Amino acid sequence: MNAPIDITNVILKTDRLTLRPWRESDLHDFYAYASVDGVGQMAGWLPHADLEESRRILTHFIDGKHTFALEYRGKVIGSLGVEEYREALYPELAALQGRSIGYVLSKTYWGQGLMPEAVKAVTQWLFNNAHLDFIFVGHFDWNNQSRRVIEKCGFRYLRSTTYETRYGTVETTMDYVLYHPERSKPHADT
């Protein structure tokens, strides 16, 4: 089942990043990467058309209390959300606590190992502090950058599903799971 998550007072530090709740003052940094063609499409959304669109989504991030801002050298360069997963697809996990993560990173910072660093910090926090039993993540079948992040972070392939994006396309997603390392898995094939 989807576990409750609230990151209101959570700040995670890695060697290069600070992961923290979003602030209204992050608006221009957010728009700077979210308006770039090719960034949002990797996660299923179109580039932001204007600052007001970014403001609306930023307000959603702040109010939702489950999306980290990724700060690098004083600038927000991406986000990592701890989202609800589609429980109906995984009835075998109904007795366990879990969530799904999703992430996006400014094109300027692709290929530098920053996203695996962020994902590892958040998964560790989710297991140790939010007491999750498992975490899902997925990528579109054509998104090799996300696949590499997922593999580097130790997730195991689970299955393929279809997903309707916010811009109306239907994509095949490759779904992965990471179980809490000190808890037993529901059964051997997942």
Predicted regions span which residues?
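Conserved GNAT-fold acetyl-CoA-binding loop/helix
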Residues: 38-58
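Short loop/turn motifs at secondary-structure junctions and domain boundaries
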Residues: 59-64
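Acyl-donor (CoA/ACP) binding surface of acyl/acetyltransferases
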Residues: 1-40, 67, 71-190
